[in-house]
């Protein structure tokens, strides 16, 4: 399991010549880092003097970010597995017409799954961004820049994951499926970039001296 590796071992694995783990798994890792960091900010707020009014929001934020953390960690490996399945389908026999038909169908189905996994990463990272915005707004002011880094990591997760969605859509024949995912991907990207901009603009303005 990729998620069980040390940071050094994971990075060494990414840096090798194998195509997995690649950008999709890294996008999921970005999302996991965003979740972990936003959880830290919430925990630095709970129980602190002056933040009593934020207690309930921070407790709820922790519940959501920890759930998303577990879900996105699972997607780190799931993305690599989806790629491996597509690769395996290309190795299927293609001597007879029947084999060619079966191979083509298998490739199409595996490619759909390879598009759906990063889409799920993008969805979860986008969900996280709304929580991060609350954590940044109401959380410990000494950790507001940590919340911003969490937001940027979540945005990176979204954009990286959506690139992997789009590259897989390019080889699919099911145009209804392609249009559906393209439409959702475009909407997610627009919302993610807007959420990041709103937070960074506000925090950078506050930090100016």
Predicted region positions:
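Short, hydrophobic/aliphatic alpha-helical segments
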Residues: 2-21
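Preference for long, well-ordered alpha-helical segments
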Residues: 128-131, 143-202, 209
